[in-house]
């Protein structure tokens, strides 16, 4: 029991308590902010997820129509399936490019009136959703979040706990 009365023991215990408090406080703060930005991404009237889901749905319709007219859509289908699980900015950029290219290919086909009308409607909705992504309030929240989380000590806690930067659509 003499070990409890030594100064070095007290310093070690105090250091461990301070370290635990800093880690716990950092975890709580960064977790709260991370959850808030994730919530902003997935829910609400103008969440990015809503627009991305619309884009994916309209893209899937275009892929199905292209298949009907014998156009190879293996790459497009692969991207579509990959985006069912997660989004990255590169994927969204690739989705826009592939939709634009596939739309041009399908438009060159001899489409019946009904298919042409549906394709035009879906393309318009896709383009509208893609444009809306750049004008929603979420982007400002994401920029603020990324700025705050890139500063010390938040950056340390984000890397320690595996919190990634928020997607910003510009």
Say what each PLM segment does.
Residues 2-170:
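A helix-centric hydrophobic-segment signal that preferentially recognizes long
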